[in-house]
């Protein structure tokens, strides 16, 4: 079994830091297309997959120093919030959600 490596507490050198997240990460993909694109609809279908991947990539590049990736986490939270608000609005208006 692999040992768990503690997160880094030293700042990542500027050359190794990931570029700041763009506003595009805060906008979810069309969830209807995302759901229909899969063979089976599951709870793991995520229209905010790009923001999720960017967050994980940031963690890997900074040796899991969470304080350097807060912008990416915020972008992911915004994306999820926008997606859930969009689904809620569609349900309230009687639109198809899947």
Curated annotation (Swiss-Prot):
Chain's gene name: COX23
Entry superkingdom: Eukaryota
Official protein name in the record: Cytochrome c oxidase-assembly factor COX23, mitochondrial
Signal peptide annotation: none
Motif (Cx9C motif 1): 48-58
Keywords: Disulfide bond, Mitochondrion, Transit peptide
InterPro entries associated with the record: COX23, Cys_alpha_HP_mot_SF
Gene3D superfamilies registered for this protein in UniProt: CytochromE C oxidase copper chaperone
Phylogenetic classification of the source organism: Eukaryota, Fungi, Dikarya, Basidiomycota, Agaricomycotina
């Amino acid at each position: 079994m692999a040992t768990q490596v503690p997160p880094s507490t030293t700042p990542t050198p500027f050359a190794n830091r990931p570029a700041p997240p763009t506003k595009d990460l805060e906008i979810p993909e069309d969830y209807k297309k995302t759901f229909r694109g899969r063979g089976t609809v599951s709870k793991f279908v995520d229209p905010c997959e790009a923001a999720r991947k960017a967050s994980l990539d940031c963690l890997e590049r900074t040796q899991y120093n969470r304080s350097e990736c807060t912008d990416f986490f915020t972008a992911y939270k915004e994306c999820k919030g926008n997606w859930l608000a969009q689904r809620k609005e569609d349900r309230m208006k009687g639109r198809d959600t899947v």
